[in-house]
């Protein structure tokens, strides 16, 4: 599924049009993580190429240890954990599962030109977002969804978009029920004093 281009083509033919229709054609930013690269690649290509949303910002949500942040921001597929003397068996040392790599998949490579920005999300912030979404919105989401949500906050902050009315779409791609033994185990251990009271405290 990493190299099979039917992956991104399905999202080009189905997910992209679904988002475009449900948002009444009004989308300013789309945010997703990269696992195979199929979701972000297919949706980005559909919105930018087929619907000609040239002003749309497409952003990658990247966990710590993954190389896509530097690939998008600086053109180099690299993370500091790869430097000489720091290589380890489990390269992507993060609680976040399902997204983040240190290689370019075909699904990502053929659609890279449609991606604009990337945000590096630390485990701590993803865990805080998980608790925030559960406590305030009743959403029990997994780790990949939570780094996507964190990237929304980063994007809004970087471009000073608070109260702008911009339409930002992110993918809630996994349920917390599939992350009970690792991610949510840590999320539930966050002390009450460390929980955030507003999204402004998150990033």
Features from the language model and the residues they span:
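A glycine-rich, Thr/Ser-enriched phosphate-binding loop motif common to dinucleotide/cofactor-binding enzymes
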Residues: 1-18, 142-147
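Active-site catalytic pocket residues across diverse enzymes, especially alpha/beta-hydrolases
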Residues: 23, 47-51, 155-160, 187
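A short, acidic, amphipathic alpha-helical segment used as a generic capping/interface helix at domain edges
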Residues: 125-128, 133, 149-160
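Active-site/ligand-binding loops adjacent to catalytic centers
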Residues: 3, 49-143, 182-203
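Short glycine/serine/threonine-rich phosphate/pyrophosphate-binding segments
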Residues: 33-44, 68-69, 144-152
């Amino acid at each position: 599924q990493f190299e099979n281009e039917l992956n991104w083509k399905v999202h080009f033919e189905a997910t992209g049009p679904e988002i475009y229709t449900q948002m009444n054609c009004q989308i300013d930013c789309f945010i997703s993580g990269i696992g195979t690269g199929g979701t972000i690649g297919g949706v980005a290509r559909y919105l930018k190429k087929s619907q000609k949303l040239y002003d749309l910002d497409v952003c990658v949500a990247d966990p710590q240890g993954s190389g896509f942040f530097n690939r998008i921001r600086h053109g180099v597929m690299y993370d500091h954990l790869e430097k000489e003397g720091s290589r380890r068996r489990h390269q992507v040392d993060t609680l976040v599962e399902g997204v983040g790599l240190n290689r370019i998949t075909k699904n990502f490579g053929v659609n890279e030109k449609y991606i604009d920005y990337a945000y590096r999300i630390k485990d701590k912030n993803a865990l805080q977002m998980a608790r925030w979404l559960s406590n305030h919105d009743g959403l029990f989401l997994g780790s990949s969804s939570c780094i996507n949500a964190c990237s929304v906050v980063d994007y809004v902050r970087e471009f000073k978009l608070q109260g702008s009315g911009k339409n930002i779409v992110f993918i809630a791609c996994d349920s917390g029920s599939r992350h009970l033994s690792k991610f949510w185990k840590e999320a539930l251990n966050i002390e009450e004093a460390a929980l955030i009271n507003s999204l402004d405290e998150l990033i």
